[in-house]
A protein has these predicted regions:
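Small, basic N-terminal interaction modules of short regulatory proteins
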Residues: 1-83
């Protein structure tokens, strides 16, 4: 999909991986650094990672982890992947 992308906000130290260009209806926090946004129909809109440089990126338990990981790699940022 052309709407898919990973964007890092340096000021907020947050990485957002957008999977769909849809409105967010519900956000589910996986832990204190990761959350998943859902559309009203249950599709995944995006995934947010807080402090990705300090804590690394953990894809464990992330829906569509392979797609999310590929978009992060394509972003050009050098985030450390952790388990």
């Amino acid at each position: 999909m052309q709407d898919q992308r990973a964007e890092y906000d340096e000021a907020k130290d947050r990485l957002y991986v957008q999977l769909l260009d849809e409105s967010v209806d519900n956000t589910v926090a996986l832990d204190d650094r990761r959350s998943v946004d859902y559309a009203a129909d249950g599709r995944i809109v995006g995934v947010q990672f807080a402090k990705p440089f300090a804590g690394g990126i953990n894809l464990s338990g992330i829906p569509l982890a392979r797609v999310v990981g590929a978009l992060i790699l394509q972003s050009g940022h050098k985030f450390r992947m952790v388990e």
